[in-house]
Regions:
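N-terminal nicking endonuclease/strand-transfer module with a His-rich metal-binding environment
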Residues: 1-223
Length: 223
């Protein structure tokens, strides 16, 4: 069952997003995990691509565009949007989903739904609980650098203009979820109804409570 999650960030350090994607982080604190010498630990397996960055580093490209349009200069501005598409762990063995295939799907999703935005697309082979759920991170600069067609989730003319910003409204998020469902149907992958929920669905708060409880039990068993 593929899921879609959205996070908005006011962090002006665009390099932090790429650091998270490339290096190991603690799943509870979200801080980098360091080795015995205090160095960052690279993730063992991932796929990473940039879109609309003109051959530049994602962070540099975003900062250049922000300065050009005089946007994202205030502390309270949302600088980037982070979307995560997580696939069902069974999609690998049952439906032939690979990291490369998921990366291609993520890039296509980004191009179709976030045109005109500088973006990072990165696929990891595993989730927080090591259950094998391949997932794709899509990080976009909130600023749009090119004029784009009026897409179904947009509700005002400014949503198409270069120099204006992406807005993840409730209606937009519902649309993106419906598109994830359509993608899974088209690709023959497992899917649940993301719009109406599931009686077996676990909320983020419940998931992390369970994870922290299990981690505490694991520590006790080692002592």
């Amino acid at each position: 069952m593929a899921t879609l999650k959205h996070l908005g960030s006011k962090n002006a350090d665009y390099g932090a997003a790429e650091q998270y994607l490339l290096f190991e982080h603690d799943e509870f604190t979200m801080k980098p995990v360091l080795d015995e010498n205090g160095r960052l630990i690279p993730r063992e397996d991932y796929r990473l691509s940039t879109l609309n960055c003109g051959g530049e580093d994602f962070a540099v490209a975003c900062m250049r565009s922000n300065l050009r349009y005089e946007k994202n200069q205030r502390r309270e501005d949302v600088k980037s949007h982070h979307y995560i598409i997580s696939f069902d762990p069974r999609d690998g063995p049952d439906n032939g989903l690979t990291v490369d295939r998921a990366q291609a799907l993520g890039e296509q999703f980004c191009k179709e739904h976030f045109p005109g935005h500088q973006a990072l697309v990165c696929t990891h082979p595993d989730g927080h609980n090591h259950s094998g759920n391949i997932h794709v991170h899509i990080v976009i600069n909130s600023l749009r650098i090119e004029e784009v067609p009026f897409l179904p989730y947009m509700d005002r003319p400014a949503d198409t203009k270069a120099g204006c910003k992406h807005r993840c409204t409730d209606a937009a998020l519902r649309y993106f979820k419906s598109e994830v469902m359509e993608m899974c149907h088209r690709e023959g992958l497992y899917q649940i109804d993301l719009l109406n929920g599931s009686k077996n669905r676990v909320t983020d708060r419940e998931y992390w409570a369970q994870k922290k409880g299990q981690a505490a039990l694991d520590r006790k068993s080692v002592v």
